[in-house]
Design a protein with these regions (language model features):
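Aromatic-rich, lipid-facing transmembrane alpha helices and their immediate juxtamembrane interface loops
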Residues: 1-130
């Protein structure tokens, strides 16, 4: 449970920080989405530990993109909060997701999965030494 809470906290902090760096602002809903997305990335890393890291990143990207679509449809379209709008981006879906930002998520997933692999190896080594 502690590991899940830590993963959620990392995502809830990191996701908004990425948005602030990229866009200059964020919204509290992005903290919730970030926490959920990092939990999903951790699950993928644990479920498929030997999988090629690019394939893991593609799975992570698919989850994040789907989550952004779902959250965007609620916070932007249904509630009208206007947290983000990709309607001017090529290939956008209802202004909520687009290929460019999915590509960015893929690039960000690569080092995340690399770090998760290192953490798993470190944990395994630490456990075997006890």
């Amino acid at each position: 449970m502690k590991e899940k809470a830590t993963a959620f906290a990392v995502g809830a902090t990191g996701y908004p920080c990425i948005e602030i760096l990229a866009r200059g602002h964020t919204h509290w809903s992005m903290a919730l989405l970030g926490g959920i997305c990092v939990l999903a990335l951790v699950w993928i890393a644990r479920r498929y530990p030997g999988m090629n890291i690019a394939v893991q990143a593609a799975l992570g990207t698919a989850f994040i993109t789907a989550a952004e679509l779902a959250v965007g449809l609620v916070v932007n379209r249904a509630l009208g909060w206007q947290v983000w709008d990709y309607s001017r981006e090529f290939g956008n879906v209802l202004g909520q997701i687009c290929p460019l930002f999915s590509f960015y998520w893929f690039l960000l997933c690569l080092p995340v999965f690399g770090l998760l692999r290192l953490a798993a190896r470190w944990k395994a080594k630490r456990t075997s030494e006890v």
